[in-house]
From Swiss-Prot:
It catalyses: 6-phospho-D-glucono-1,5-lactone + H2O = 6-phospho-D-gluconate + H(+). Pfam families: Glucosamine_iso. Coiled coil: none annotated. Pathway: Carbohydrate degradation; pentose phosphate pathway; D-ribulose 5-phosphate from D-glucose 6-phosphate (oxidative stage): step 2/3. This is 6-phosphogluconolactonase. SUPFAM superfamilies: NagB/RpiA/CoA transferase-like. Hydrolysis of 6-phosphogluconolactone to 6-phosphogluconate. GO terms for biological process: carbohydrate metabolic process; pentose-phosphate shunt. Keywords: Hydrolase. Belongs to the glucosamine/galactosamine-6-phosphate isomerase family. 6-phosphogluconolactonase subfamily. Its EC number is 3.1.1.31. GO terms for molecular function: 6-phosphogluconolactonase activity.
């Protein structure tokens, strides 16, 4: 368990390698399971990767696509991760995949209802593709919040970041550790510094990504691009 680190000089080569690894995992997992489930992270960073994955010649009709996390906003909003996946991943060949939303089409102000909706519709992913912020957060598990530390068995947790906008729904540490594999994609010198600190210091309260990298339950394959 723990992690494996793969380093690349640029993002193009990094995404190429990650795309090949994704294909390998996808095809191998389908041999073991009748249907596979894969969760994707949002944000601006993975757009080019999502576009590359969307054109892969895979058995997408046997794949369930879900989100690692989502902001509690209308799913047509530009900051919505749901919109991001529909715009960049669920296109081309990947349009044949089925999408499992974290939020209903009509967003209410009742966060408990949204929390219940997300957990009721949750399907445990075989693979989750993660990103990481310069503050060490992953999914929507942020520093100085308690959501990622709880030992309860919810698959989806409600988080309220201190230094980021919007309340969010996020896969819990428990759900992430129940994946067969995790991929972490990061780039840039600053994030490399955060990664190295997380690898040296298992301090999940200040660096949530450390909780994942030091997991005894799941291996994280880290794809790092220098530029």
């Amino acid at each position: 368990m723990g992690y494996q680190l793969f380093e690349f000089e640029n993002l193009k080569d990094c995404h190429k390698a990650l795309t090949e690894r994704f294909k390998e995992f996808f095809n191998t997992a389908l041999k073991k399971h009748h249907q596979i489930s894969i969760a994707f992270s949002g944000g601006r960073s993975p757009i080019s990767l999502l576009q590359k994955l969307s054109v892969l010649n895979l058995k997408w009709h046997e794949c369930l696509i879900s989100l690692v996390d989502e902001r509690i906003i209308d799913t047509s909003h530009d900051d919505s991760n749901t919109k991001l996946l529909h715009d960049y991943l669920l296109q081309n060949n990947a349009l044949k995949a089925s999408f499992i939303p974290l939020l209903p089409e009509k967003i209410s102000s009742d966060t408990n209802a949204l929390f219940n909706f997300a957990n009721q519709h949750f399907k445990q992913p075989h693979l989750a593709i993660l990103g990481m912020g310069t503050d060490g957060h992953t999914a929507s598990l942020f520093p100085e919040t308690s959501a990622f530390l709880n030992e309860e068995k919810e698959n989806i947790v409600l988080t309220k970041p201190i230094n980021a906008p919007y309340e969010r729904l996020s896969m819990s540490v428990n759900a992430l550790e129940n994946c067969e594999k995790l991929f972490l994609s990061i780039s840039g010198v600053e994030k490399r510094g955060v990664l190295e600190k997380a690898l040296k210091e298992n301090a999940p309260y200040s660096l949530p990504i450390a909780r994942i990298l030091h997991s005894q339950k799941v291996t994280t394959e880290v794809f790092y691009a220098k530029n």
